[in-house]
From Swiss-Prot:
It comes from Homo sapiens (Human). Interacts with the coatomer complex. Interacts with the C-terminal appendage domain of COPG1. This is ADP-ribosylation factor GTPase-activating protein 2. It is a peripheral membrane protein. The modification N-acetylalanine is found at A2. The modification Phosphoserine is found at S140, S146, S201, S237, S240, S312, S334, S340, S364, S368, S432, S433, S513. Residues 242-308 form a coiled coil. One of its GO terms (biological process) is COPI coating of Golgi vesicle. Residues 97-521 are annotated as: Required for interaction with coatomer.
Length: 521
């Protein structure tokens, strides 16, 4: 493998190539003193146009600096020697490529043919000359004295003039007509050959000068075009923008189509999963109906009264796969049961029967409701199964002795107790939170309640003040008012109504849970 050229050889070669007039301007824009080169086309470019060529890709144009890069190889140097701005301009013009847009110009058929031609010429020059710095056709790039010297050598070689005629060949071309007359006058026998030979040399020099002038004209024209075009940013044409816009529209359509396909697949998978879920719900509903049918009469009535009897509910239902239907609101069974419980609790005798046994329901929801309404011993489901003691007047505890965690449940039935609070404290000038929530001591509360009752009377007795009402009433008339003071009766009624409110809230929670779980049927 041949050794790579050193830095001195590279600088010498490019100094000579850039001395050619056509290589002193940029090939694309005509800017002066280009310092970059496209090895693919063998042309010299300015720094702006070199950036445009880099954006095209190395498969279209390979760019290197003639001053900064020192890793040139012999094949790349041969491509620059066989190329040149003049040869590239003539080739593109000959094949009808006059486009100014770089993308259009270097993707054309003419650019492809010229790339192949430069590659072939560079390979041939490398195989012929090897590591020699100069090649044969470099003589056309040197100054004009070399052809004249060759012509003079040619004439001296063939005419063999005498020694005294030698000084006549040394002057420049402007003094050549005088020696021609002398030679024609001195050597008469050789007049014909000498005249012909001397007559050909001026023609050759004239032709050479005309070719040089012809080469300068395109360079001047390019300089004018470069001055009009200005910076490289003005090379972008409307065609490139339209092409980019078209590509963007195609990409947008493709993205929309992909999004639509993905959405369609998601909908199909959702419909399939909904069908499976609906089938599972149908199977579960049939199982629950069978369980409910196997219940005995009393338990079945209790389940239907609490809203757990799915068979007795309305047969109107809808599927998740069918169209939606408007379902009219019906009065829940739990509301009727709660109202009936309130009516039953108004009578003291029926209070001993107790609430229904929720442990007997077919859905085994006792633990969930026990955890929802707090773990109170009085409302636990395990305690419901035990035999409840008979409720008497002495077994009723005051509000202050009850568990504090029940107040969270009582807050939910505050709407039912608001009317009682208004009636209780209607005549009071000021009340406290202990009075409102019943957190006062029993004796103090009873004394205050008696004072409030006797505030409007004109005269009072000790029996009225201390609650000794035996003398006022007959012995035969025994009632709840005779057994309990007025304050205790109010507390008893309030306790009964609070219990009824709790039962209503609990029944409502049972109904809501059943509707949430089995409402899709």
């Amino acid at each position: 493998m041949a050794a790579e050229p050193n830095k001195t050889e590279i600088q010498t070669l490019f100094k000579r190539l850039r001395a050619v007039p056509t290589n002193k301007a940029c090939f694309d824009c005509g800017a002066k003193n280009p310092s970059w080169a496209s090895i693919t086309y063998g042309v010299f470019l300015c720094i702006d146009c070199s950036g445009v060529h880099r954006s095209l890709g190395v498969h279209l144009s390979f760019i290197r600096s003639t001053e900064l890069d020192s890793n040139w190889n012999w094949f790349q140097l041969r491509c620059m020697q066989v190329g040149g701005n003049a040869n590239a301009t003539a080739f593109f013009r000959q094949h009808g490529c006059t486009a100014n847009d770089a993308n259009t110009k270097y993707n054309s058929r003419a650019a492809q043919m010229y790339r192949e031609k430069i590659r072939q010429l560079g390979s041939a020059a490398l195989a012929r000359h090897g590591t020699d710095l100069w090649i044969d056709n470099m003589s056309s790039a040197v100054p004009n004295h070399s052809p004249e010297k060759k012509d003079s050598d040619f004439f001296t070689e063939h005419t063999q003039p005498p020694a005294w005629d030698a000084p006549a060949t040394e002057p420049s071309g402007t003094q050549q007509p005088a020696p021609s007359t002398e030679s024609s006058g001195l050597a008469q026998p050789e007049h014909g050959p000498n005249t012909d030979l001397l007559g050909t040399s001026p023609k050759a020099s004239l032709e050479l000068k005309s070719s040089i002038i012809g080469k300068k004209k395109p360079a001047a024209a390019k300089k004018g075009l470069g001055a009009k075009k200005g910076l490289g940013a003005q090379k972008v044409s409307s065609q490139s923008f339209s092409e980019i816009e078209r590509q963007a529209q195609v990409a947008e359509k493709l993205r929309e189509q992909q999004a639509a396909d993905a959405k369609k697949q998601a909908e199909e998978s959702m419909v399939a999963s909904m069908r499976l879920a609906y089938q599972e719900l149908q199977i579960d509903r049939k199982k629950e109906e069978k369980k409910l049918q196997n219940l005995e009469g009393k338990k079945r009535e209790q389940a239907e009264r609490l809203g757990m009897g799915l068979v007795s509910r309305s047969s109107v239902s809808h599927s998740v796969l069918s169209e939606m239907q408007v379902i009219e609101q019906e009065t829940p069974v739990s509301a009727k049961s709660s109202r009936s419980q309130l009516d039953l609790f108004d009578d003291v005798g029926t209070f001993a029967s107790g609430p229904p046994k929720y442990k007997d329901n077919p859905f085994s929801l006792g633990e969930s409701f026990g955890s929802r309404w707090d773990t109170d011993a009085a409302w636990g489901m395990d305690r419901v199964e035990e035999k409840e003691p008979e409720v008497t007047i002495s077994s009723i505890r005051p509000i202050s002795e009850r568990a504090t965690n029940r107040r969270e449940v009582e807050s939910r039935s505050s709407g039912l107790e608001s009317s009682e609070a208004r009636q209780k404290f209607a005549g009071a000038k000021a009340i406290s939170s202990d009075m409102f929530f019943g957190r006062e001591v029993d004796a103090e509360y009873e004394a205050r309640s008696r004072l409030q009752q006797l505030s409007g009377s004109s005269a009072i007795s000790s029996s009225d003040l201390f609650g000794d009402m035996d003398g006022a009433h007959g012995a035969g008339s025994v009632s709840l008012g005779n057994v309990l003071p007025t304050a205790d009766i109010a507390q008893f009624k309030q306790g009964v109504k609070s219990v009824a409110g709790k039962m209503a809230v609990l029944a409502n929670g049972v109904m809501n849970s059943l509707q949430d779980r089995y409402g899709s049927y």
